[in-house]
Amino acid sequence: PSDKRLDADISPKPTIFLPSVAETNLHKTGTYLCILEKFFPDVIRVYWKDKNGNTILDSQEGDTLKTKGTYMKFSWLTVPERSMGKEHRCIVKHENNKGGADQEIFFPSIKKVATTCWQDKNDVLQLQFMSTSAYYTYLLLLLKSVIYLAIISFSLLRRTSVCCNEKRS
């Protein structure tokens, strides 16, 4: 349509999400998510492969949705525990890809990411505890500051009202 500028970048913009630690520990699977946004026109093809493989993997995708004159689509790949050590790629075919080539979005091995980030499962709990503690500490400090503000404001207002009353007498 005529509402699209010719110089505008209307190729798919990817946002990726890796499987959560909770999902991999609880369900022994991992879901990789690729969200493609701000592309035009709406004709797009998304599929998944292993990093060095040519076989198209079984994946799912949502409907193409219109958002503010452009489109968005999401696709996800759920891999079993035995495939979590592999790297994967999401391949996007769209007529406005830069250079006219397929866009390949690489996803690292979840086992590699998990072992790099967390040496021990207790590290995750420790991080959660630290985050929660920091949250409540900052909340307490904010509350303390508000109380001090109220006390100082009350004292200053009372002082000015006392000063003003003495001058009138």
Curated annotation (Swiss-Prot):
The chain crosses the membrane at residues 137-157. Residues 1-136 are annotated as: C region. SUPFAM superfamilies: Immunoglobulin (SSF48726). The keyword Disulfide bond does not apply. Keywords: Immunoglobulin domain, Membrane, Receptor, Transmembrane, Transmembrane helix. GO terms for cellular component: external side of plasma membrane. Residues 158-169 are cytoplasmic. Signal peptide: none annotated. InterPro entries: Ig-like_dom, Ig-like_dom_sf, Ig-like_fold, Ig_C1-set, TRG_var/const_region. It is a single-pass membrane protein. Pfam families: C1-set. CDD domains: IgC1_TCR_gamma. It is found in: Membrane. SMART domains: IGc1. It comes from the Eukaryota. Coiled coil: none annotated. This is T-cell receptor gamma chain C region DFL12.
